[in-house]
Amino acid sequence: MEIIRFFLIILMWFLIIGFSCNFIMQTISYSFYKSAKKINEISYEPQFIKFNDTLTGYGYNLEKPSDRVILFFSGSNYIAYNSVGIYSGKFDCTFISADYYGTQHSKGKMNLKTMQQTATELYDWAEKEYPQAHIVIMGHSYGTGIATYLAGVREVQSLFIAAGYRDVSDLYNKMVPIFWGPLRIFISNNIQAAEYAKNVSCPVYVIGSDSDTTLNASLQKKVAECFNNSEIKIFDDVSHEDYLSL
């Protein structure tokens, strides 16, 4: 009986640690979008967009005639305003980013389902507003998972991934290295990009860097292998935050 009691205690603490670590990591990840502030120094003036009564975001070159529209899904801290303000003018076409439900001015609760909903509703709005344009999906870091999801459920011209991951355990394990193998079961709202990749039929371009210490070059090679039709480019001296500055 003592042995059984001992193992039950171990199991109890194992579960407590697993679920607690997941809660902490998810809270941190979401806080980057919920609590991020607008940056003061921007290169391009973002235009506020209300996609529907509860979903908002920003865009640039919204009136510019173009055969392409870029839908951008950002990494941590790069809310829609910041993404558009820093990166949008580097592209000679319409550039749009939405804030996930439950963040910034978008109402509701942030979770996996509403992040996916954000993506599809952003796409549907863009398709309606720009019916003649090809839609290109771009994702960076945390945003690459939802970008991959969208490319698998909607028709897009191409998908660009900068510093991607296979599921969020690749991110969580950088800080709390416990979510390996079957222990990934503790992760709630897991963005399973490797599974989404199986549904992507458009050309995919994966970008990494030997200088990226957050989501490294070797991981990007594994990410590229998840797709049926992908190309990969590894740079030498690009940091994790600077891919779109190339």
Regions found by a protein language model. Name each.
Residues 130-141:
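Alpha/beta-hydrolase fold nucleophile elbow
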Residues 144-196:
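Hydrolase active-site cap/lid region
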Residues 3-51, 56-60:
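An N-terminal hydrophobic leader/cap segment in hydrolases
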Residues 54-125, 138, 145:
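Membrane-embedded segments
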